Swiss-Prot record:
This is UDP-N-acetylglucosamine 1-carboxyvinyltransferase. UDP-N-acetyl-alpha-D-glucosamine binds at residues 93, 122-126, 304, 326. It comes from the Bacteria. Its EC number is 2.5.1.7. Pfam families: EPSP_synthase. One of its GO terms (molecular function) is UDP-N-acetylglucosamine 1-carboxyvinyltransferase activity. One of its GO terms (cellular component) is cytoplasm. It is an enzyme of class 2 (transferase). Keywords: Cell cycle, Cell division, Cell shape, Cell wall biogenesis/degradation, Cytoplasm, Peptidoglycan synthesis, Pyruvate, Transferase. PANTHER family: UDP-N-ACETYLGLUCOSAMINE 1-CARBOXYVINYLTRANSFERASE. InterPro entries: Enolpyruvate_Tfrase_dom (IPR001986), Enolpyruvate_Tfrase_sf (IPR036968), MurA_subfamily (IPR050068), RNA3'P_cycl/enolpyr_Trfase_a/b (IPR013792), UDP_GlcNAc_COvinyl_MurA (IPR005750). Coiled coil: none annotated. GO terms for biological process: cell division; cell wall organization; peptidoglycan biosynthetic process; regulation of cell shape; UDP-N-acetylgalactosamine biosynthetic process. It comes from Laribacter hongkongensis (strain HLHK9).
Length: 417
C-alpha cells in the first residue's frame, strides 16, 4: 500500500499550479448523460474519483475519449444501461450524480446507494424528495434507488443545503416539462460552474450563485465546450501549507473570488495575501496565530478546509476553536495529530487546539480525504520523519500532491505500492 514519507524541511517557496476542481468536474462529467452530442471538457483533474466516474459512464455505454489527461470528450449517444452498479458506486459517493440526468433523459435510472468517505451519513433523501416532487416514481430496494417517469417542473424546497442534491435536481430539471424552482439551493461555486456548463449546452437556468435557482426545461440539450473551474480546496490546502511553514507561495490558476472565507482566516492568522484574477500570493513572515472558525455552507467557511486549519492551529500561537456543523464524525484526524504532539480537546462537534512550538514526526493513518491532507501539512512542520499511510484517500482529491509540494521545497516522497 502506498504511503507518503515527509521530513520537515523549512519554508515552502515558489509557484504551484492549481488543478481543476474535483467537486466541479464530477457533476459536469455526469452532465454528459443529458445529451447525445459531444461534451468537451478541459482542466479536468487527474484523480481517482474522476477515473471512477469515467468507468461508471463507460459502463453505462458512454464513450469517453481522453488524448490529454486533463481534456475529455464525452458522448452519451450510445448509452444502453441506466444502472449504476454497487461495485463502482461503493467507492465514491458522487456516483449518485448520475441519477438525475439519467432519469431526465431516459425516463428511468437505477443507482446503488453510495459509499465514499467515512465522515457521516450524508443521506440522499433530498435528491429523492426533489425527484419525487418532479413526478418520478421512486423505490429503494436491494440497496438501489430505482426511479421512473417523465419529469415535470416543480417547486422544490430543500430541507437542508446539499451540494450534490442541488446538482442532481438541477441536471434533472433541465429536461423536465415546464419550470422548476429550487429553493434553499447550495450556492457553492462548483454548483455555479455546473450551471454555467449546462447553460452552454442549451439549458435555461437563472439565479446562478444564489439560493434560488429557476430552470426552464427544454426539449433537448446539445454539445458544448467547458473549462472546469480551479479547485479552491486544493488552493486553500497549499496556502495553509505556506502559512504553516512560514513560506512564500504564488498559486497559479487560482480564483480568489471563490475563496473569501479561507483567505480571510489566513489573513487573521497573520498571512499577507495578494491576488489577481487567476493567481493568489501568500507571504507568512512569522508563526501563525490561532484562529477560531465554524464550518457552514458557502459563502461561509468550508467543511473541506476544516482539517487543514486544525493542523495549522496545532502549531499556531494561542488557542483556537473549530466547530464542525456540516458533517458528524469529521474529527477523525484528531487522534493522529495528537500522536504527533498536538494538544486538542474535542467535545461533540467542537475542537479546541492549544498551539505547541513543535510537532514530532510519526507514522499516522489517513481516514478520509481532507483528514489525510491535514496529516501531510503536519508532517511538513514536524521534527523528524512522518509516514502517512492509506493515501488512496488523498489521491481521490489531490493531483500529484507530492510533486507539487516537492517543487516548492518540501521533502516528500511516495513509497510502497
Amino acid at each position: 500500500m502506498e504511503k507518503l514519507k515527509i521530513t520537515g524541511n523549512g519554508p515552502l517557496k515558489g509557484d504551484i499550479t492549481v488543478s481543476g476542481a474535483k467537486n466541479a468536474a464530477l457533476p459536469i462529467l455526469c452532465a454528459s448523460l443529458l445529451t447525445a452530442d459531444t461534451l468537451r471538457l478541459t482542466n479536468v483533474p487527474q484523480l481517482r474519483d474522476v477515473m471512477t466516474t469515467q468507468k461508471l459512464l463507460q459502463g453505462m455505454g458512454a464513450r469517453v475519449m481522453t488524448d490529454n489527461v486533463h481534456e475529455f470528450e464525452l458522448s452519451a449517444a450510445q448509452v444502453s444501461d441506466t444502472c449504476a452498479p454497487y461495485e463502482l458506486v461503493k467507492t465514491m459517493r458522487a456516483s449518485i450524480l448520475v441519477l438525475g440526468p439519467t432519469l431526465a433523459r431516459f425516463g428511468e435510472a437505477s443507482v446503488s446507494l453510495p459509499g465514499g468517505c467515512a465522515i457521516g451519513s450524508r443521506p440522499v433523501d433530498q435528491h429523492i424528495k426533489g425527484l419525487a416532487a418532479m413526478g418520478a416514481d421512486i423505490v429503494i430496494e436491494h440497496g438501489y434507488v430505482k426511479a421512473r417517469g417523465r419529469l415535470k417542473g416543480a417547486r422544490v424546497v430543500m430541507d437542508m443545503v446539499t451540494v450534490t442534491g442541488t446538482e442532481n435536481l438541477l441536471m434533472a430539471a433541465t429536461l423536465a416539462d415546464g419550470t422548476t424552482v429550487l429553493e434553499n439551493a447550495a450556492r457553492e461555486p462548483e454548483v455555479t460552474d455546473l450551471a454555467v456548463c449546462l447553460n452552454k449546452m442549451g439549458a435555461r437556468i437563472s439565479g446562478l450563485g444564489t439560493d434560488r435557482l429557476v430552470i426552464e426545461g427544454v426539449e433537448r440539450l446539445h454539445g458544448a465546450e467547458h473549462a472546469v473551474m480551479p479547485d479552491r480546496i486544493e488552493a486553500g490546502t497549499f496556502l495553509v501549507a505556506g502559512a504553516m511553514t512560514q513560506g512564500k507561495l504564488v498559486l497559479r490558476n487560482a480564483r480568489a473570488a471563490d475563496m473569501g472565507a479561507i483567505l480571510d482566516k489566513l489573513a487573521e492568522a497573520g498571512a499577507v495575501i495578494e491576488a489577481g484574477d487567476d493567481w493568489i500570493a501568500l507571504d507568512m513572515p512569522q508563526r501563525p496565530r490561532a484562529v477560531s472558525l465554524r464550518t457552514l455552507p458557502y459563502p461561509a467557511f468550508p467543511t473541506d478546509m476544516q482539517a487543514q486549519f486544525m493542523a495549522m492551529n496545532c502549531i499556531a500561537e494561542g488557542v483556537g476553536s473549530i466547530k464542525e456543523t456540516i458533517f458528524e464524525n469529521r474529527f477523525m484526524h484528531v487522534p493522529e495529530l495528537i500522536r504527533m504532539g498536538a494538544r486538542i480537546d474535542v467535545e461533540g462537534n467542537l475542537a479546541t487546539t492549544h498551539g505547541v512550538n513543535k510537532l514530532s514526526g510519526a507514522t499516522v493513518m489517513a481516514t478520509d480525504l481532507r483528514a489525510s491532507a491535514s496529516l501531510v501539512l503536519a508532517g511538513l512542520v514536524a521534527d523528524g520523519t512522518t509516514i502517512v499511510d492509506r493515501i488512496y484517500h488523498l489521491d481521490r482529491g489531490y493531483e500529484h500532491i507530492e510533486r507539487k509540494l516537492g517543487a516548492v521545497g518540501a521533502q516528500i516522497e511516495r513509497t510502497g505500492g
